[in-house]
Amino acid sequence: MHRLNKKAGDYGEKAAEIYLKKSGYTILNRNFRCFLGEVDIIAKNKDYITFVEVKSRWSDTYGLPCEAVNYRKKLKIYRTAKYYIASKSLINYNFRFDVIEVILNHQNDSYDLKFIENAFQI
């Protein structure tokens, strides 16, 4: 089961990256990790740096993917983002936290993607 979930996560992150690029974003970092946590995608669009959490599922039977981004997860993303901002001296930008949901199709390589801009604030 773990391998299947990893495959869904990898596929979802790639789909999210393609979507963001097509929407005019520049990808600054994927899977940024530090001692505070991880951010799936860090992207730039105009004067915004966005910290994107990607949630992928094989179905929405047990709830929407974004429902897995609980307060604790949001706090980890926020702290990791603060570290990234400080380490890169990105003081002249606005910042935003987005979520991308990806529901994968078992039968083929298709998927449904939902971009939730400004999904949360802390």
Curated annotation (Swiss-Prot):
It comes from Clostridium acetobutylicum (strain ATCC 824 / DSM 792 / JCM 1419 / IAM 19013 / LMG 5710 / NBRC 13948 / NRRL B-527 / VKM B-1787 / 2291 / W). InterPro entries: Restrct_endonuc-II-like, tRNA_endonuc-like_dom_sf, UPF0102_YraN-like. This is UPF0102 protein CA_C1763. Belongs to the UPF0102 family. CDD domains: PoNe_Nuclease (cd20736). NCBIfam families: PRK12497.1-3, YraN family protein. It comes from the Bacteria. SUPFAM superfamilies: Restriction endonuclease-like. Pfam families: UPF0102 (PF02021). The lineage of its organism: Bacteria, Bacillati, Bacillota, Clostridia, Eubacteriales. GO terms for molecular function: nucleic acid binding.
